Amino acid sequence: DDRTSRGLGDVYKRQIGAVVATTATAIFAGDIPGALLRIPGTPASAAYVEESHLLSKKGQLELALGSNVICSAIGGLVGALVFILAAPSLAEIALLFSSYEYFWLTVLGLSCAVIISRGSQVKGTISLVFGLFLSTIGLDIAMGYPRFSFGSVDLAAGISILPALIGSFAISEIIRKVTTTDLRGEKIQQEIGNLLRGVGSVLWRFRLNVARGSTLGTLIGALPGAGADMAAYISFAIGKQYSKEKGSYGTGHVEALVDSSSANNASVSGAYVPALVFGIPGDTLTAIVIGVLFMKGINPGPTVFINTPEFVYAIFIMFLIANICLVPLGIIAIKLSRYVLSIPPSLLFPMILMTCVIGTFAVH
């Protein structure tokens, strides 16, 4: 009956609201362990985890995380406003991208990963080639033959991104710190003071970086499948290329955080453009939103703005509210994170290792 339909409609609205709020805040949440432990919480946070952690080791944890949360909120708000004002236009641009454009965009993203690599770019290139090799493991999409599976049924499914990232960043960092001769010698600032001190001057000094990162993030996010991690890497590389302080990169430079954190959060709202206008998911999370809309009987596409505008505008408002709430909630999360650093390393690293293993298997 009508009451049942309204009840189900409320449930779906809450589900979409939860997904939107999560996508708008999750990337910044991944910045916190990156700064504290050099273990990024999300793939998008990996682009600048080194700079963020080095800032923390220099006693500038407040500046690093304060800049992260404010730039993430600004990038998210800019992306949401562009999403509201220009969703159909951005979708038309995204549809002009063929396989050729996506190929060169991927090449650009991979090149940026080498450019921003710390130290020798030869080592960065070797790491890139090794990563590309890992991505070829599994069934060949065109022919259906297993590649480099060595007779293993598990490898025939390929190596998914989550285990690869956990192994590359989390497990490797745990091994590095456990094997350090003097584990206590590597100190990270444990007291967290005023997170907004100095952030205003940073934003004014790098205001063009914020605008550029937010714009790039929104445009890249509107491309189906590009994602926030590609937006972060490309924005980082472009920011480094045009920076007046290139020599400061790799030593803990806040400019890198400004570029990348504003870009990756802006790309989240941009990913909803192809999802709502054409029903093409911009990333994995927008694919979930499309699934929820289909369960509600709403077909994403050009008609969604005409037939069910209340859902579209609800998502607009949810994005704005989520990014506004990101600042106070992010500050609270940062304040609480200091308790992580008070845990003895002999307990902390086994706990992180156990969480990594559980998280990897939980995906399947």
At which residue positions do the language-model features occur?
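Single conserved hydrophobic/aromatic residue that forms the stacking wall/gate
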Residues: 2-12
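Alpha-helical transmembrane segments in multi-pass membrane proteins
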Residues: 5, 17, 21-33, 67-75, ...
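Membrane-interface alpha-helices at helix entry/exit sites of multi-pass transporters
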Residues: 16-17, 54-71, 244-256, 287
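Short helical (or helix-break) motifs at transmembrane helix termini and adjacent helical loops
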Residues: 30-34, 42-55, 232-237, 271
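Short amphipathic alpha-helical coupling elements at transmembrane boundaries
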Residues: 47-58, 92-95, 201, 205, ...
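Membrane-embedded alpha-helical modules
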Residues: 66-179, 295-364
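Intrinsically disordered, low-complexity non-transmembrane regions of multi-pass membrane transporters
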Residues: 142, 174-210, 241-254
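Membrane-water interface at loop-to-transmembrane-helix junctions
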Residues: 197-215, 254-258, 309-314, 343
